């Protein structure tokens, strides 16, 4: 009898977990539009963290940097190295864009593991990391697509479109399709990894004591950082590809 009750309780917990739907959202009605409030709230929190951190560091710059300034200088140097490696000698104007992508995704990913979003009650759905929502990752991927089109057109003008018939016009459909698969792969890779990590943690916390999921949480922090680096590196690589005209 006890075994049966335990099995029923376990199945009930699994059913409760399965009720967390990716499409269950909280909306604001603004005029005639429905605004996805969950993503906006968590994104504003992440942006506020980045802006406040940057303000605290740059308000009192010193020749001999303290810990905060030294850390930000290291991050900036790291982003510059990634940009230069992937884009080439014309990397300078693109450092702010690549850096913004990396820092926003990095802090967003970590916020999902470190912030107690779920204690904030909403009428519908629940708060989570911004990158846990497909709308955010698709928006970031589309921004990247706009960036590498702009990079190619500003460097080569209309001659940029000649790449679609190189090395032979037969590859025209494939080259066009590639421009659609790039943002799709960027967005779904990031979304899938972050969503899977959070779901694994939720399932483990529901089924086993809290101590057991802790290693998975630390692994999630590591993979979250890696995903931010992969996204920023690929974005820089696509921009460099548009500028240099090679694959």
From Swiss-Prot:
It is found in: Plastid, Chloroplast thylakoid membrane. The chain crosses the membrane at residues 38-58, 95-115, 134-154, 199-219, 220-240. It holds the Pfam family ATP-synt_A. Keywords: ATP synthesis, CF(0), Chloroplast, Hydrogen ion transport, Ion transport, Membrane, Plastid, Thylakoid, Transmembrane, Transmembrane helix, Transport. GO terms for cellular component: chloroplast thylakoid membrane; plasma membrane; proton-transporting ATP synthase complex. GO terms for molecular function: proton-transporting ATP synthase activity, rotational mechanism. PROSITE patterns: ATPASE_A. The keyword Transmembrane applies. SUPFAM superfamilies: F1F0 ATP synthase subunit A. It is a multi-pass membrane protein. Belongs to the ATPase A chain family. F-type ATPases have 2 components, CF(1) - the catalytic core - and CF(0) - the membrane proton channel. CF(1) has five subunits: alpha(3), beta(3), gamma(1), delta(1), epsilon(1). CF(0) has four main subunits: a, b, b' and c. NCBIfam families: ATP_synt_6_or_A. PANTHER family: ATP SYNTHASE SUBUNIT A, CHLOROPLASTIC. Key component of the proton channel; it plays a direct role in the translocation of protons across the membrane. This is ATP synthase subunit a, chloroplastic. It comes from Phaseolus vulgaris.
């Amino acid at each position: 009898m006890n075994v049966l009750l335990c099995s029923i309780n376990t199945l009930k917990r699994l059913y409760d977990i399965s009720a967390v739907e990716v499409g269950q959202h909280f909306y604001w009605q603004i005029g005639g539009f429905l605004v996805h409030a969950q993503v906006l709230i968590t994104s504003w929190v992440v942006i506020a963290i980045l802006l406040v951190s940057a303000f605290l560091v740059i308000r009192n710059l010193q020749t001999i940097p303290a810990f905060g300034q030294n850390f930000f200088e290291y991050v900036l140097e790291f982003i510059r190295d990634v940009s230069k490696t992937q884009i080439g000698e014309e990397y300078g104007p693109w450092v702010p864009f690549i850096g913004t992508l990396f820092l926003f995704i990095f802090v967003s990913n970590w916020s999902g593991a470190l912030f107690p979003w779920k204690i904030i009650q909403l009428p519908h759905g629940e708060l989570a990391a911004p990158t846990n929502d497909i709308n955010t990752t698709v928006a970031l991927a589309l921004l990247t697509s706009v960036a590498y089109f702009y990079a190619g057109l500003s460097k080569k003008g209309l001659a940029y479109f000649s790449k679609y018939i190189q090395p032979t016009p037969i590859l025209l459909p494939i080259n066009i399709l590639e421009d659609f698969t790039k943002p799709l792969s960027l967005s779904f890779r990031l979304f899938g990894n972050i969503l899977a990590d959070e779901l694994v943690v939720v399932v483990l916390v529901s089924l086993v004591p809290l101590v057991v999921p802790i290693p998975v949480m630390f692994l999630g922090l590591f993979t979250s950082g890696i995903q931010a680096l992969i996204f920023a590196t690929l974005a820089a690589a696509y921009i460099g590809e548009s500028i240099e005209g090679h694959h």
